[in-house]
């Protein structure tokens, strides 16, 4: 299957043959497993001190005193039990708990291939919430000269020429302050995902693109399901460079 390649000004340059990965069957169930596996891989097992709340000389006075049979200190204050100040926790976190959802290597690659194919389906991309009115084609492939851009304003001009500005505005306007304790823990804002830029190798365009609201940049070799299907939802609006397409041909 061939797809058009666009210059930085939005004009057509020619065509490029897509790898067969863009024809993979859409499997949202496999994609979800792969993304969850990537998310849970970040978690660190944790547990409480086995002796937490147990370091006390408190003893129970037994029955027949008209009071609860909890362990008490010499002053009569309850201790040791979960409802007492300084007592143990009823169900503390266990280091033995399995936090990481494991996934087979072939299944993970199948999920990535399926997510890549979904990014070329206009119905799936639109259903995810992206603004694709006026976008020339999907998948959207741009000239390799894009990787040499240094300034963010240069990248923005390319996005405008390719009719991606509406989706950038959607992401910018969708930034909201979260409710709850997240504001105090370094994750104050909820930020929608916009365009994913996939380049061939590390280049100047990486730093130039990532400063735009909702835009992420990744190399073709580092691309995984969590990038192209964030939140387990496939169909992210993706901009590919010619070099990235060639790297995909080598990878799949």
Swiss-Prot record:
Keywords: Ribonucleoprotein, Ribosomal protein, RNA-binding, rRNA-binding
Cross-referenced Pfam families: Ribosomal_L4
One GO process term, biological-process aspect: translation
Protein's UniProt keywords contain rRNA-binding: yes
GO molecular function: rRNA binding; structural constituent of ribosome
Domain of life: Archaea
Keyword field contains Zinc-finger: no
Subunit-level organization: Part of the 50S ribosomal subunit.
Protein role: One of the primary rRNA binding proteins, this protein initially binds near the 5'-end of the 23S rRNA. It is important during the early stages of 50S assembly. It makes multiple contacts with different domains of the 23S rRNA in the assembled 50S subunit and ribosome. Forms part of the polypeptide exit tunnel.
Family: Belongs to the universal ribosomal protein uL4 family.
NCBIfam families from the UniProt entry: rpl4p_arch
HAMAP family xref list: Ribosomal_uL4_A
The name this protein goes by in its record: Large ribosomal subunit protein uL4
Highest classification ranks of the organism: Archaea, Methanobacteriati, Methanobacteriota, Methanomada group, Methanococci
Gene: rpl4
